[in-house]
Each structure stands twice: as structure tokens, then as C-alpha cells.
Amino acid sequence: FAQEARAVMASVLRLGRDELATMLQLSPKLRDEGTARLRTFFDPDVTELPAALSYTGMVFRKLSASTFTAEDWAWAAEHLRITSFVYGLLSPQTAIRYDRMEGAVQLPDLYDGRLFDYWRDHLTPYLIEEVQRAGGTLLFLASDEMRGLFHWAEVERAVRVITPTFLVRQPTGKLKQIVVYTKMARGAMAGAIIRQRLEEEEAWRALTPEGFVFSPEESSDRDWTFVLG
């Protein structure tokens, strides 16, 4: 989706600095640096990195793609896809540039709606085709909002979607989602699957990412719950 990514960024860069900073919810401290970095997107000498190394959030820290072997990278290229509001859907090896963006951003000269809406028709058939080619099951480890990039009901009709949830048991016995732990577990789970070449659901359930353990009592066929504590 390189052509679409260029169109998105060309439209983004027509916005003023303050308008762009507001859309991206940048703090005053980050406004100048963040918008300046985006404005280098089309510079010919800008550094590009593989997508799995370009992002620095907690999920990607725990994925730890910098420690992948050549065989890990090859397997990940066949089995892992990364969502992006600028690039759409990425292979972990695809070289990209800095692309901080929000799905709710509206770019009237590109599309009559949000970036979420812009991408749905592009990405839905592609994701379905990729999942079917890889065996027909999607283990969804992205954040919940990323469903908005797709016609999600159509995806769920076409392929088997499994969504893990990671919950921490409180002293009261209640289960609670803690966002940073969820991000850590998602990245660790993806990394373990890649390094161990795991393709069976039973093997996925047996994983204990960041200490979270699969709980049959709290899970259904497609909504899996992993519990810590």
C-alpha cells in the first residue's frame, strides 16, 4: 500500500503545524518535534527501518524483533502483519519511515471521513486473503481500535478470529485489565509464536506470555482469557 501511504502523508502535510498537533493529540512539549519529523516523510535521505524495528511502543519492545534470527524474520514475514494508519497493513520486514498518526484524523482532500474509513475497503479483502493463505485463523494481538481499519464483521465471517485478553487477578479475586501488562503480553506472545514457529491453537494456549496463563473457565472458543496471579 505504498501509493496509499504517500497519498495519506501528502494530505497530512497540507495541514498546519497546530492543526496537525491537535489531530494527533500531541502535548506542547512534543508538538514541534513530532510535526517536524512527519514533515521529513518525503525527504530522500530519511532513514527507513523494517516495520517491526521502527515502532518503539511496549508491544514492540516485548516482540524484540532486534533479536530475531534470519529464520525468525523469514517465518514472521509469512505469519505476522502490523497495522498502521499511514501504511495500512505491513509485513514486519517492510521498510518504513516515521509515521505517527491517529485513526480518527480527517483529511478532507483525501477522503470524506476518517483514516479508519479510508482504509477499510483497501485492507479488508487483503487481510482476509492473507489469513486464508496462512491457514484460515487470525490470532488478533493488535489493540482493539485497530479493528476499525477493517470491515470487521466481514473479516469474522471469512476467517476464524481468536482474540486473547490478558487480565490480572486482584486481591479481591476480581479480574482487571491493566493496559501496560496487556501490551507486554501481546508483544511477548507474538515473539514466542515466531521464535517457536507455533501454528496450532493448542500451542498458543500453552504459552505463558509475561506470566499470564490461559484460563479455560474464563474463555470461549474465540475469546481467550489469560490470567496473571
Place the predicted regions along the sequence by residue.
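Active-site helix-to-loop segments that bind/position phosphate- or nucleotide-bearing substrates
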Residues: F1-T67
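Internal, well-folded beta-alpha domain core
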Residues: A65-G229
